[in-house]
A protein has these predicted regions:
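Conserved N-terminal ligand/cofactor-binding loop architecture of enzyme catalytic domains
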Residues: 4-69, 105-185
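A short, basic/flexible loop-to-alpha-helix module at the beginning of a structural domain
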Residues: 70-86, 185, 225
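A short, charged/proline- and glycine-enriched loop
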Residues: 79-89, 212, 293-300
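A short, glycine/small-residue-rich beta-strand->loop->alpha-helix junction that serves as a flexible
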Residues: 94-105
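Conserved nucleotide-sugar donor-interacting segment of glycosyltransferase catalytic cores
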Residues: 95, 127-134, 178-238, 242
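Short, surface-exposed amphipathic charged segments that create phosphate/polyanion-binding patches used
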Residues: 134-138, 231-235, 279-289
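Active-site-proximal region of nucleotide-activated glycan assembly enzymes
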Residues: 210-281
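Active-site donor-nucleotide binding/catalytic segment of nucleotide-sugar enzymes
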Residues: 269-271, 280-284, 288-307
Length: 307
């Protein structure tokens, strides 16, 4: 399978040779560490999710040996499923932190409410694959950095600049795209016509590399960063003020004016919120107003976590 290279040119912006070489080097480093399974033909099984299978109609996609899948429990005897190529939607995630997980749940909830079958594809759960090993290594690094950032000096000199400027650069996306090529094999035996919604950029990038035909990249952050680019997919954003920043790739190549994202690659969709919360908005607001008028305490529903 010949993948289209997504690292040397990003939305028409040519990367310097040294950036491209660094990206290739990054991929080689991971191959050396975790192996290259691009020729592997992993079996794929579908089974009902034990936790949100009944409530949200979610099915897990297991890749490779089920025993090496984080979501598999041999004693659960979960109901087996099949791929619904007419009404199926894959929610691709990496189980990284609360924010991404919450958004994944919201996507599954909205899909079910609209009559679709949501499939849960956690790229960080396939123990025998290079994909999961690469994601695990990057998650560990991010987690370590996050914990170290409690130190004000580390936070000021390393963590904040990396989060605000490092992740913002197109050069970062070039390396990510090369690494994401190593994640593509998990999609090999997944029907290519089923739409994929990535709630993290890696499942979206990997899906595009693997030849999935309809890929949505649900961007969680409103601060425009090249980290969140997955060329070849439709990017969605949650608020108006980030639209132009992403569209013109603002500040992603230092002071240079970049070629923009094509208009059909970016869509303002509004907030990623579970159907169960949205459907009660009017009644809930009326109840809040009633409570206020009666002098009762105000109550808030807050989700605590990243995105």
């Amino acid at each position: 399978e010949n993948m289209t290279d997504r690292s040397s040119v990003i939305f028409g912006n040519k990367m310097p040779d040294k950036v491209y070489k660094k990206a290739v080097k990054s991929k080689k480093k991971y191959i050396k560490k975790f192996g290259d399974d691009s020729k592997k033909n992993y079996e794929v099984t579908v089974e009902k999710n034990r936790y949100i299978g009944d409530s949200l109609g979610v099915y897990n996609i297991l890749v490779g040996n089920p025993a090496e899948n984080a979501h598999y429990d041999v004693n659960a005897h979960a109901e087996k499923g099949t791929f619904d190529t007419e009404k199926g939607i894959i929610v691709g995630n990496i189980r990284m932190g609360f924010g991404h997980y919450r958004i994944s749940m919201a996507m599954a909830s909205a899909a079910k409410a609209m009559g679709y079958t949501p499939y849960w594809m956690d790229l960080n759960s396939y123990g025998e694959t290079t994909c999961t090993k690469v994601i695990g290594a990057q998650n560990d690094l991010y987690s370590l950095g996050s914990r170290l950032s409690k130190n004000p000096i580390f936070n000021k000199l390393v963590w904040e600049p990396m989060n605000y400027e490092g992740f913002r650069a197109l050069s970062y996306n070039a390396a990510d795209q090369k690494n994401a090529e190593l994640m593509a094999p998990v999609y090999r035996n997944v029907p290519k016509d089923i739409p994929v919604i990535g709630t993290h950029v890696w499942p979206a990038q990997a899906a595009v590399h693997a030849g999935m035909k309809y890929v949505v990249n649900a961007i969680p952050d409103n601060w425009p960063m090249a980290l969140h680019l997955s060329e070849g997919s439709v990017h969605t954003i949650q608020c108006h003020n980030s639209y132009m920043g992403y569209r013109i790739l603002n500040g992603m190549n230092k002071d240079k004016v970049n070629k923009p994202m094509p208009s059909d690659s970016l869509v303002y969709t509004g907030h990623y919120i579970d159907h169960e919360i949205v459907q009660g908005i009017e009644a809930d607001c009326e109840a809040r107003i009633r409570r206020k008028e009666n002098g009762e305490p105000m109550r808030f529903l807050l989700t605590i976590g990243g995105a």
